[in-house]
Amino acid sequence: MSFSMRNGAHLIWIGLLVCCLVDMGASMEFTGAEGQWARFPMWNACCESEMSFNMKTKSAHGLLVYFDDEGFCDFLELLIHNGRLSLRFSIFCAEPATVFSDTAVNDSRWHAVTLRRNFKNTTLVVDEEIKWVEVKSKRRDMTVFSHLFLGGIPPELRSVALRLTSSAIKDEVPYKGWITNLRVNGSEPVLIGSDGVNSDICEADHICLNGGVCSIVNDEPICDCSETGFQGKDCSEEEAYVGGLAHLMMGDQGKRKEREEYMATFKGSEYFCYDLSPNPIQSSSDEITLSFKTLQRNGLMLHTGKSADYVNLALKNGAVSLVINLGSGAFEALVEPVNGKFNDNAWHDVKVTRNLRQHSGIGHAMVNKLHCSVTISVDGILTTTGYTQEDYTMLGSDDFFYVGGSPSTADLPGSPVSNNFMGCLKEVVYKNNDVRLELSRLAKLGDPKMKVSGVVAFKCENVATLDPVTFETPESFITLDKWSAKKAGSISFDFRTTEPNGLLLFSHGKPKPQQQKDPKSPKTLKVDFFAIEMLDGHLYLLLDMGSGTTKTRAVNKKVNDGEWYHVDFQRDGRSGTISVNSIRTPYNAPGESEILDLDDKLYLGGLPEDRAGLIFPTEVWTALLNYGYVGCVRDLFMDGQSKDIRRIAEAQRAVGVKPSCSKEPPKQCLSNPCLNSGTCREGWNRYVCDCSGTGYLGRSCERDATILSYDGSKFMKIQLPVVMHTEAEDVSLRFRSQRAYGVLMATTSQNSADTLRLELDGGRVRLTVNLDCIRINCTTSKGPETIFSGQNLNDNEWHTVRVVRRGKSLKLMVDDLQPSEGQITGDHTQLEFHNVETGIVTEKRYMPAVPSNFIGHLQGLSFNGMSYIDLCKNGDIDYCELNAMIGYRSIVADPVTFKSRSSYVTLPTLQAYYSMHLFFQFKTTSPDGLILYNRGDGNDFIVVELVKGYLHYVSDLGNGAHLIKGNSNTPLNDNHWHNVMISRDTNNLHTVKIDTKITTQTTMGAKNLDLKGDLYVGGVAKDMYKDLPKLVHSKEGFQGCLASVDLNGRLPDLQSDALSTAGQVERGCEGPSTTCQEDSCSNQGVCLQQWEGFSCDCSMTSYGGPLCNDPGTTYIFGRDGGLIVYTWPPNDRPSTRADRLAVGFSTQQKDAVLVRVDSSSGLGDYLQLQIERGNIKVVFNVGTDDINIEETSKFVNDGKYHIVRFTRSGGNATLQVDDLPVIERYPSGNIDNERLAIARQRIPYRLGRVVDDWLLDKGRQLTIFNSQTTIKIGGWEKGSRPFQGQLSGLYYNGLKVLNMAAEGDPNVRVEGSARLVGDMPSSSITPQSSVSAAGNRSETSPSITDITTTTASNRQGKQTTTPQDDLLVASAECPSDDEDIDPCDPSSGGLAHPPLPEAKGYPSPEVIRESSSTTGMVVGIVAAAALCILILLYAMYKYRNRDEGSYHVDESRNYISNSATQPNGAAVKEKPIGVPKNKKDKKNKDKEYYV
């Protein structure tokens, strides 16, 4: 059968041009004339509805669709704007929403257009492009009143005002082109009326006869008769058949009115096979024609030939593929449509022609050479032409003609696809000069040479599409049947994702025990396996047939960009190819095995949670890293057979597998879904939270991660059920520690030295990876690879560590620091391990050096996706051993108690030559004591000690001793645990950290600390203290507890590891058996906590005894008056900035002097405690004016026992009687300070510093009680008011004068009527302690400020706080610089007031501020003016004759109070010194303020 060449080609061209109009329904031609319109019934597009049509135009502008609510708010318009569709609509007068298509529609091609309304949303679909837009309206529904208009608006609507809701629509030009197949909600609307619109000419009856297809070309109807068996203008003429071979002339060749179409439906497993062996083909020119209709993207349509002589016609990714090889190389052609794909479920016609042509060649000889030109056209429009190579021009085939598929499509030579066709094929015809094979017809008629495989329906039926599925989570997967591809096979599929990692396909075979050369080595399991995985966006093929693994990167570009990719894997024996979007990559498997034995099921998208029985080869990294695939998969074919994975997923009820595929915009992280500072990244339609640095777990980092506390003896050990072999690991954890050393995590093996270990090493994180090459008979290993990152990580803060290994590549990340990277140098990349251990390495058999145990906290350990700490703690795994403490616990490791100051232990020499990291914890109540000492060569040594409650670190590297004082707010002997870290780096940067406070200093010179001999801990032998370096203050050892001792990464046991032990050193730390309580001491006595009990400081109570409840030493002063005088030795007269006085008494006198303290003759400083008009009053003068403080709210001359407490600091004072509120006195500012400030402005600049220093010294002197000489008790002196009554328990600045009088102290004399009552009380320690009784001076509390104190009251509900004003000596103040070498060392005579605990719920002391100007004072000043002048002259005379030696302060007597200085040595800021404005008798002395 052949066409008339005059009409045939023309009709085919035209017929194919309009083939898509078949079954499109009525069509309309819009001429584009002025006033053109077409009116249809109202489309109620309020809620959910759809409208669709096909269009063809070449105009760049025009109105397509319009309707509205007739002038109110709502409208919708669809225009052509610049060749693209523009959709614009509004609801409820909202701002109109607009969307533009990307597809150009003015290309004179047919385009399918759909409008979908869904309340506020409207979707525009142009061919395969989908765009949607939402209007920001307060109402959901669209109101429609008008008709549906196409192509234009009637003139009457344009002329009437307010009839059109969209004012701009009347200016739009009419549409010019074709519209067909109009549907509204699935049905064809009725045309109400039109103007300027032509109906389809082809609708008239009998335009084309015998089933010819009518179309309009140049406004004329044209008939396509190609499928009718007729020809002519109206398909009425009979087609002439040319006779051929008898065996091909089948069926009726005569006339017929209607020609039957031969078609068949293929569903993926069916195919036709025509046997050519009886009559092989041998041709130089031939033609193949067929029509197809499908929704599938890939599939074989026709194939004939084998080896290097074949023709292959297939659908490949929606395009038509032709491959021809005549023996000298393949000619390949790929025809793709301009828009969309050919798998659009519409009929498409394919024609392939091959003709022999003669071409002139230029060369040695002018020879005409023959070439074969090949032309392929689809739908008569898309044509590709090429030439086969010159040497071979004949197609010869004695094989088979395959139609719709084959038994093994992947094995066909030149086949670009591996799966069979799914859809409809009709009129498949091959013909050459000699033969015409109507293959579709032969199959239906059952020709004996034609074999039909499968159940084929010889009509076109709908073929179920292979719907895509989406794997929504890494845990989702589908199980497929076992893939039997022992010798050869193929798998193809499409996928799309934006995620970088995931296991797409995996299957393995039966385990094969491997024989090891070393009989001691365990047997390992070897399996055949097949996998396709994604890592870092790249696609990999992995294959092992038993003789070695091949790993092939399918394509060099990354394939996680969200686009569809077609993957086709084909294998034949040891070789094969994997292609991605036609980019083919070959591979060759190593070894000799050609059989792939896969015994297990094939897993798609991931692996099951229960993996018992599964064996993961080390080469499949995604399986071991637990990277499941997240994304879409479609069109899966195995050996050419389709797999409906949607139905399979539904049948398996696969969790997390959705039967569709849509790509959402990457906006998942915009709402900040990751809580607790988790890091968010966009995944495939999901967000992915990185919680590794947060301390939380869960999809959104919403769940607290378990914290484990390690004290050096605790661990967590994961004992895996089977030995693991990996080539890739992901490890992350958080830790917090104060030690510079300790193992964080390690993998260990029972059979080798393999390990991946994370540990702290000198404050840095160290990663060690050791792959034991020796046992596995590979290239000898060069030793473990080591990488460091971070510094000073032992700061007791949380730090995050991440490790990523991929084969030989290592990456270590700490917090947000720059990653440290490394490479494994050996050939071996496999890590073997049985255990994952934390805290302690218990599998030590093959370790040359065991890392130090960990002390600190771990959280969030994740190893290859497994959160082992929480899995173990929650009981989700039963192969873990855990004894670490759960939760955040305060860690005290291996505590040891030094029971006495003479106890100590010795350890081997401290190794600190280049650098040093020491850590320990201590708890004590002792203010002083030697903690560590190690001597060295020459002058080298190191000492750590407590001095008055503060830590001192002393060292000498050969350049002289250097002292660093630790920084702490309060003394450290408070019976609480304190953490101490001392380090020295290679640059001589010394660091001392106490709890959270850090002190650093760099020393110059020598950098090496060369120690030798034993390391003493807790003290040294008694006879060694005198030989300690000068900067070492300790004279006794440390009494208290030490714990968590870390000596440069070594954790010694202070008992079992000790070389020697002296005194009582016991394990554990119980602390004091008796502790201070609120009521431990009576009468406001201060409780002093000591290691073996407590004692009471009764100084300011007037009482005595162990608990301050015994009467103090009491004297009765008779009616004739008595006097007790204490006189300081001439060289021991103190000068004080602060004073403390307490005494108890009973009397009935209204006026009397109780106590008076005087300075040396001529100075005039004094302090006097007296009763005036029945009230207690104190008057003192320290170089300014007399300052008074008085308690007027209570009379004390009632014969009852009263206690008076007085303190002074400079010019400030406090007074308390009994339990009354404390009265505070703050004098007003000194007027002379203002005068001096004015004078300072006139002092030359060069003398400014000198004057300032002098003024500062004068200011200090104005607050000092100078050169105290006597303490007089009883007031029996000439002109005074003697006291009559009882005085008890007198205390003044550490002196208990009444006790001293009773004991006959030579510095005390008793005169007149003063008689001792009762026995002298004593102040001793509680029964649990062993402190001796007090002597003449207060010896019970020489360092009260270094001890935790509790003040007790003998009355409920009344608690008074003793003022913090302290004793100071002007010429011997405590240094305030931390770098000072000699600390302040007050003598036993200076008693400091101890710090008190916070008073809660008690009233604040009453503060009384006296006025500096009263009427009485003014009158007194006026009356005494003349007397003041005489006194002033006398004072000046005394000054000129005064010896400077009278201002000498004996520095050997130090009355400085520790509590008067800040913990770092700075003096407490004093309150301003005030002097009344109207001064009384001024003392014009040089120590005052005259310049």
Swiss-Prot record:
Keywords assigned by UniProt, alphabetized: Calcium, Cell adhesion, Disulfide bond, EGF-like domain, Membrane, Metal-binding, Repeat, Signal, Transmembrane, Transmembrane helix
Kindly give the membrane topology term recorded for this protein: Single-pass type I membrane protein
Q: Which CDD domains match?
A: EGF_CA (cd00054), LamG (cd00110)
* Disulfide links within the chain: 202-214, 208-223, 225-235, 424-460, 632-661, 669-680, 674-689, 691-701, 1041-1069, 1076-1087, 1081-1096, 1098-1108
Pfam families from the xrefs?
EGF (PF00008), Laminin_G_2 (PF02210)
Name of the protein? Neurexin-1a
**Location(s) in or outside the cell:** Membrane
What domain of life is recorded for the organism? Eukaryota
Q: List membrane-spanning regions.
A: 1416-1436
Tell me which residues bind Ca(2+).
309, 326, 394
Family matches, as SMART domains: 4.1m, EGF, LamG
Please give the residue ranges for the topological domain Cytoplasmic: 1437-1491
Q: Which organism is it from?
A: Danio rerio (Zebrafish)
Signal peptide range equals 1-27
Q: What does this protein do?
A: Neuronal cell surface protein that may be involved in cell recognition and cell adhesion.
From start to end residue, where is composition biased (Low complexity)? 1322-1353
Which family does the similarity line name? Belongs to the neurexin family.
User: Its Gene Ontology biological processes?
Assistant: cell adhesion; sprouting angiogenesis
- Output compositional bias ranges, type Polar residues: 1354-1364
Domain Laminin G-like residues, every copy = 28-208, 263-460, 467-661, 707-880, 894-1069, 1113-1314
Identify the residues that the record assigns to the EGF-like domain, covering every copy.
Answer: 198-236, 665-702, 1072-1109
Indicate the principal place this protein occupies in or around the cell: membrane
Cross-referenced PANTHER family, in alphabetical order? PIKACHURIN-LIKE PROTEIN, SP2353, ISOFORM A
Under the heading SUPFAM superfamilies, the entry gives: Concanavalin A-like lectins/glucanases (SSF49899)
